[in-house]
Amino acid sequence: MAKAKFERTKPHVNIGTIGHVDHGKTSLTAAITIVLAKTGGAKATAYDQIDAAPEEKERGITISTAHVEYETKNRHYAHVDCPGHADYVKNMITGAAQMDGAILVVSAADGPMPQTREHILLAKQVGVPAMVVFLNKVDMVDDPDLLELVEMEVRELLSKYGFPGDEIPVIKGSALQALEGKPEGEKAINELMDAVDSYIPQPVRATDKPFLMPIEDVFSISGRGTVVTGRVESGIIKVGEEIEIVGLKDTQKTTCTGVEMFRKLLDEGQSGDNVGILLRGTKREEVERGQVLAKPGSIKPHDKFEAEVYVLSKEEGGRHTPFTNDYRPQFYFRTTDVTGTIKLPFDKQMVMPGDNATFTVELIKPIAMQEGLKFSIREGGRTVGAGVVTKINN
């Protein structure tokens, strides 16, 4: 059987459902596929198919995630749903499932709960750009004043964590009614998808971002100069363009005099390509793995930052004991490890395996970084944590 070719006729967006346990995230995910299947925009996927999410490994961490895909009139969506709260924390911090936007599911019968707060905070920390709210289980609430109160609470909570709480669309409905095929249930799902279509912005494609390539290897080719290899993370590099070598040492300027892929010479390399880049006048010993090639001025090296981190549990192969202030592990950014010291907030004595925490890191050498950059924490060659840079401290 030939594999169906993925037709990319519509713009693609990655989204996910977030919210408190039992507020109906998985029911909503199933309802979206079932309602959109009626117009041919999805394959109807039952609740139990989504709930039995397969385990995946991302940077040594096991995460259960269900993926469904569907399309509206305007877009193609890849949608992630996680069965457990811990899976969300890991997913958002590792970026295993990149989210361009989220659907926050809140039960109208219960209102915002602790994980509602935690997911909103995490979404802000890891840079989820926008979200839409689905107030679920409205069929269980008879009092319209109560619905209004819950909506106000959710909007206040979103504003508190830096989202535009007053303007975020809030759709009221019942995923269960939609699953049962009731017209009011389906109407709410269609309203929700219209809101997602119009309110969640189209992500900037990787090729439209400034050029950046983490250096994996460096070679010296006699008579031609120094070649660095790696996978282009974003943007496009053209032969003849000026670039900077950033991280670990002082930033150096150089020029790309050749781009090679699979032993063929190209005019340009673009995001996703594994390329060799020839650098004019750069000596082999001036460049090393762990640095990046970048568009001049687009990224700076830093050695102090704040991070949101998930610490692996003992069962996941992490530490067996908590760590305290001044813990000095290795931080693995893109292609290299750099030693750093962890500074915990004043009110935190220690971080337990299986927890997520916010703290400051001071590296012994600067790394090219921007907010949103992912990293692993390693100790003796094994991964003990995963994190994301939330703020750079100069």
Curated annotation (Swiss-Prot):
Q: Which Gene3D superfamilies match?
A: P-loop containing nucleotide triphosphate hydrolases (3.40.50.300), Translation factors (2.40.30.10)
Subcellular localization, as worded in the UniProt entry: Cytoplasm
Q: Does the keyword Ribonucleoprotein apply?
A: no
Which residues take part in binding GTP? 19-26, 81-85, 136-139
Renumbered to this chain, region (G3) spans 81-84
Query: What superkingdom heads the lineage?
Result: Bacteria
Q: Which positions, given as ranges, span the membrane?
A: none
Q: Name one GO cellular component term.
A: cytoplasm
Name the Pfam families for this protein.
Answer: GTP_EFTU, GTP_EFTU_D2, GTP_EFTU_D3
Q: Which residues form the tr-type G domain?
A: 10-204
* Region annotated G5, chain positions: 174-176
Residue ranges of region G4? 136-139
Residues covered by region (G2): 60-64
Specify whether Manganese is a keyword of the entry. Answer: no
Q: What is its EC number?
A: 3.6.5.3
> So what does this thing catalyse?
GTP + H2O = GDP + phosphate + H(+)
Positions of the UniProt region annotated as G1? 19-26
Q: Give GO MF terms, alphabetically.
A: GTP binding; GTPase activity; guanosine tetraphosphate binding; translation elongation factor activity
Provide the primary localization.
Answer: cytoplasm
As for family, the record states:
Belongs to the TRAFAC class translation factor GTPase superfamily. Classic translation factor GTPase family. EF-Tu/EF-1A subfamily.
What is this protein for, i.e. what is its function? Answer: GTP hydrolase that promotes the GTP-dependent binding of aminoacyl-tRNA to the A-site of ribosomes during protein biosynthesis.
Provide the assembly information: Monomer.
What's the protein name?
A: Elongation factor Tu
**What are the top taxonomic ranks of the organism?**
Bacteria, Pseudomonadati, Pseudomonadota, Alphaproteobacteria, Rickettsiales
* Name of the encoding gene: tuf
